[in-house]
From Swiss-Prot:
Gene3D superfamilies: Ribosomal protein L31. Zn(2+) binds at residues 16, 18, 38, 41. The lineage of its organism: Bacteria, Pseudomonadati, Pseudomonadota, Gammaproteobacteria, Candidatus Pseudothioglobaceae. This is Large ribosomal subunit protein bL31. Binds the 23S rRNA. It holds the Pfam family Ribosomal_L31. Belongs to the bacterial ribosomal protein bL31 family. Type A subfamily. GO terms for molecular function: metal ion binding; rRNA binding; structural constituent of ribosome. Part of the 50S ribosomal subunit. GO terms for biological process: translation.
Length: 70
């Protein structure tokens, strides 16, 4: 492996807007990285995800195909 062509691999403190912090390693030159969303507060990971049904498309689909037999 060639020397001096690879980026430095530094310790980085990740800070989320929810207050969660953890330490990882990265090639960025900063000591801290501020995030808006992490796995502790993201709706997909917390189970609080909402499914948006715009204009009743699910109901329209169900009513259209309700008469078909399986």
């Amino acid at each position: 492996m060639k020397t001096s062509i690879h980026p430095n691999y530094n310790d980085v403190q990740i800070i989320c807007s929810c207050g969660n912090t953890f330490k990882t390693r990265s090639t960025i030159d900063k000591k801290e990285l501020h995030l808006d969303v992490c796995s502790s507060c993201h709706p997909f990971y917390t189970g609080k995800q909402k499914i948006m049904d715009s204009a009743g498309r699910v109901e329209k689909f169900k009513s259209r195909y309700a008469s078909f037999k399986r």
